[in-house]
Amino acid sequence: MESPLGSDLSRLVRIWRALIDHRLKPLELTQTHWITLHNICQLPPEQSQIQLAKAIGIEQPSLVRTLDQLEEKGLITRHTCSNDRRAKRIKLTKSAEPIIQKVNNVIHTTREEILNGINQEEIQWLSQMISKLEKNILELYNKS
């Protein structure tokens, strides 16, 4: 019988995410908030919601709810783009900086604990296998 690799990977992602959510709870944030904030930090300043959604790999309507929550928490601002009134630009607030640092510390510590007992060579091998799987999946997806 073949290994249920897809199920195993899905379960791994689910419990990893649950652990991150649990550890970010004292900051009143979730893994989804972290991914969004992380991508805002990685992109050039004042990216549009469309560009951010593409970077994260989700549809724009899915992103709006998360951005609403981050705006309510005072971590981002959104303003209308001057050349396209339909587009919104996203900017981190000053109060986001210390929160992002705390979140990054939680993520870093959690990642180190999860990878405890796995050496760098094994991590590199796993990353290569994941890249191969992703490449194969994307090729299959693009064929259909």
Swiss-Prot record:
InterPro entries: HTH_MarR-typ (IPR000835), MarR/SlyA-like (IPR039422), Tscrpt_reg_MarR-type_CS (IPR023187), Tscrpt_reg_SlyA (IPR023071), WH-like_DNA-bd_sf (IPR036388), WH_DNA-bd_sf (IPR036390). One of its GO terms (biological process) is response to stress. Keywords: Activator, DNA-binding, Repressor, Transcription, Transcription regulation. Residues 2-135 form the HTH marR-type domain. It comes from the Bacteria. GO terms for molecular function: DNA binding; DNA-binding transcription factor activity. Residues 49-72 bind DNA. Transcription regulator that can specifically activate or repress expression of target genes. HAMAP family: HTH_type_SlyA (MF_01819). Belongs to the SlyA family. Homodimer. This is Transcriptional regulator SlyA. It comes from Wigglesworthia glossinidia brevipalpis.
